[in-house]
């Protein structure tokens, strides 16, 4: 709501259309973002957790639950029957379940003191109305102010190289780098804990490697610019090792590749790729037996 309020002068037409449709179909009021923002700030702080829990207990009853079970239809696959699932649900009522305790760390993203760099040179860019900054670490930065959005800063960094600089025998491992690198989180925060630490902030950073480039990108609200820079620093310097998260990633990848191998179109696609690229090692699709 805060973001929509800050961007109220740049509201897209589609947002207005959705408002009108919901008003016509559901009789939903259209007070305007200014009123909604004021109401949220007045009402939300006065809603205790106990009140939310009480409403949830009223919403979830024995007669309005639906269980969905999904899985591949193949020989050897065994799934519980409708009766067995119903028995499990009934049995759950006798379990001694304790309320979930959410542990949120007050630790800062970066605990040590970091020596900042300097701007070595600054001059007007040659095109697009940019300002060119050269930093003491060798990075060249182009700054471009726009009026596209009033409450957003967008960042993108590129360096050249990518997977092309690695030998062919390493390409299978490198192909999973984007998925594996940050699976354990960054700094002292797991992926889950990082999300909790960023609650209330609007900042995100991602990094990736392509065939010929390495990239880092991010966006944030102006008030959270420092947080975005901290996330960028940790992404480069402190990917977090988490063996449990890594094993979970491998298991998910194996299941995904196993299901892909069961699809006849996968074999067809692999054949076309092999013919087009002459069985080149960089064009080989990863298989389940390659994961370990």
Q: What is each model feature region?
A:
Residues 18, 22-160, 164-167:
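Proteolytic maturation boundary segments
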């Amino acid at each position: 709501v805060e973001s929509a309020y800050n961007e109220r002068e740049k509201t897209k037409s589609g947002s207005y259309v959705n408002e009108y449709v919901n008003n016509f179909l559901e009789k939903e009021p259209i007070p305007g973002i200014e009123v909604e923002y004021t109401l949220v700030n007045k009402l939300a702080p006065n809603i205790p957790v106990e009140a939310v829990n009480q409403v949830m207990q009223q919403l979830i009853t024995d007669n309005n639950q639906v269980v969905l079970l999904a899985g591949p239809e193949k020989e050897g696959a065994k799934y519980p029957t409708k009766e067995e699932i119903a028995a499990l649900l009934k049995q759950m009522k006798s379990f001694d379940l304790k309320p979930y305790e959410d542990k949120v760390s007050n630790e800062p993203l970066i605990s040590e003191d970091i020596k900042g760099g300097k701007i070595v040179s600054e001059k007007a860019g040659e095109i697009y109305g940019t300002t060119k900054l050269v930093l003491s670490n060798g990075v060249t930065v182009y700054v471009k102010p726009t009026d596209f959005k009033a409450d957003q800063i967008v960042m993108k960094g590129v360096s050249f190289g990518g997977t092309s600089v690695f030998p062919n025998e390493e390409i299978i491992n490198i192909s999973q780098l984007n998925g594996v690198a940050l699976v354990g989180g960054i700094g002292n925060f797991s992926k889950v804990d990082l999300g909790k630490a960023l609650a209330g902030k609007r900042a995100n950073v991602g990094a990736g490697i392509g065939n010929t480039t390495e990239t880092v990108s991010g966006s944030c609200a102006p008030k959270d610019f420092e947080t975005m820079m901290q996330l960028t620093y940790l992404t480069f310097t402190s990917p977090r090792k988490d063996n449990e998260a890594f094993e979970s990633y491998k298991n998910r990848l194996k299941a995904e590749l196993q299901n892909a191998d069961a699809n006849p179109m996968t074999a067809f696609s692999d054949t076309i790729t092999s013919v087009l690229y002459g069985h080149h090692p960089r064009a080989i699709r990863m298989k389940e037996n390659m994961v370990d």
